[in-house]
């Protein structure tokens, strides 16, 4: 019988967290990752579940997520250590029937708990389920270096940051035509930043936390990692451009419109019309 640590979802979390650490996006215990599962994903591994699963009450009701299992990273856990001890650094949790709390079915050993950003994750999952008709299953938060750097030098508004990232790399408009949401600086952890993030997730698959990091959403771990990786690559290009004196030429408005038509995507209007 296969052990849960060999399952596609545990192995996927190991790869995503290891890759993110190697990218330099998740120093120490920075960053967190959650993947929405189906009952059929976890049912074959019930023999590996805790005999007496701990129950933790949520800070607010999440009826949309009732009876839904997730695999999550733990609070205070280092991404670089997930591959060394998955059961200590990851956990499979399942929301109860009324969305009031969850049981820790597997992992998070030694009384560990899920990430402190769980409210932001679960609220964002709710919005992305509605926005994508259930297709999006992953929420990833990391400290992508160049995206953070841009929040210090660009005006922090969605239209401008989206437009600059589109100009930084041709593929960006195709990968995130819905643009990049951005919050004001907020204290991480509490429900307030989670609610603000979820509100932006209604419209955008990427949301920046200024001077802190980025949230990304997608249908798979691979797609979500690639989404953030694409935006971060463009941000790196922009950081180099600004350090060399700024743009002398760039992708024009007309070219962005043509790009959207070629790939059948509708670019965020406020970013297209900015200049």
From Swiss-Prot:
One MF annotation (Gene Ontology) recorded for this entry: metal ion binding
Co-factor binding details: Binds 1 zinc ion per subunit.
SMART domains per record: Aldolase_II
UniProt catalytic activity: L-rhamnulose 1-phosphate = (S)-lactaldehyde + dihydroxyacetone phosphate
GO cellular component terms given for this protein: cytosol
Obligatory cofactor(s): Zn(2+)
Pathway: Carbohydrate degradation; L-rhamnose degradation; glycerone phosphate from L-rhamnose: step 3/3
Alphabetical UniProt keywords: Cytoplasm, Lyase, Metal-binding, Rhamnose metabolism, Zinc
Location of this chain's protein in the cell: Cytoplasm
EC number from the UniProt entry: 4.1.2.19
Active-site residues from the entry: 117
Primary location group: cytoplasm
Record: residues binding Zn(2+): 141, 143, 212
Record-linked NCBIfam families: PRK03634.1, rhamnu_1P_ald
Subunit structure: Homotetramer.
Family label: Belongs to the aldolase class II family. RhaD subfamily.
Task of the protein: Catalyzes the reversible cleavage of L-rhamnulose-1-phosphate to dihydroxyacetone phosphate (DHAP) and L-lactaldehyde.
Name listed for the protein in its UniProt record: Putative rhamnulose-1-phosphate aldolase
Gene that this polypeptide is encoded by: rhaD
């Amino acid at each position: 019988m296969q052990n849960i640590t060999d399952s596609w979802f545990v192995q996927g979390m190991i790869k995503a967290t290891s890759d993110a650490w190697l990218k330099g996006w998740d120093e120490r215990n920075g960053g967190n990752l959650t993947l929405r599962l189906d009952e059929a994903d976890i049912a074959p591994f019930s023999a590996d579940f805790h005999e007496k699963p701990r129950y933790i009450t949520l800070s607010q009701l999440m009826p949309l997520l009732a009876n839904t299992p997730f695999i999550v990273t733990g609070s205070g856990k280092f991404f670089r250590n997930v591959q060394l001890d998955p059961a200590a650094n990851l956990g499979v949790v399942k929301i109860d029937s009324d969305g009031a709390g969850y049981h820790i079915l597997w992992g998070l050993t030694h009384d560990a708990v899920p990430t402190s950003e769980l409210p932001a994750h679960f609220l964002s999952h709710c919005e992305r389920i509605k926005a994508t008709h259930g297709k999006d299953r992953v929420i990833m938060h990391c400290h992508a270096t160049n995206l953070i750097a841009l929040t210090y030098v660009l005006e922090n508004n969605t239209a401008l940051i989206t437009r600059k990232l589109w100009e930084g790399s041709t593929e960006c408009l195709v990968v995130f035509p819905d643009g990049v949401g951005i919050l004001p600086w907020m204290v991480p952890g509490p429900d307030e930043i989670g609610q603000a993030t979820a509100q932006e997730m209604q419209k955008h698959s990427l949301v920046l936390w200024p001077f802190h990091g980025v949230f990304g959403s997608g249908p798979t771990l691979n797609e979500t990692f690639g989404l953030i990786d694409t935006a971060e690559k463009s941000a790196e290009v922009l950081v180099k451009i600004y350090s060399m004196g700024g743009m002398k030429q760039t992708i024009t408005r007309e070219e962005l419109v043509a790009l959207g038509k070629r790939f059948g995507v509708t670019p965020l209007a406020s970013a297209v019309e900015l200049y």
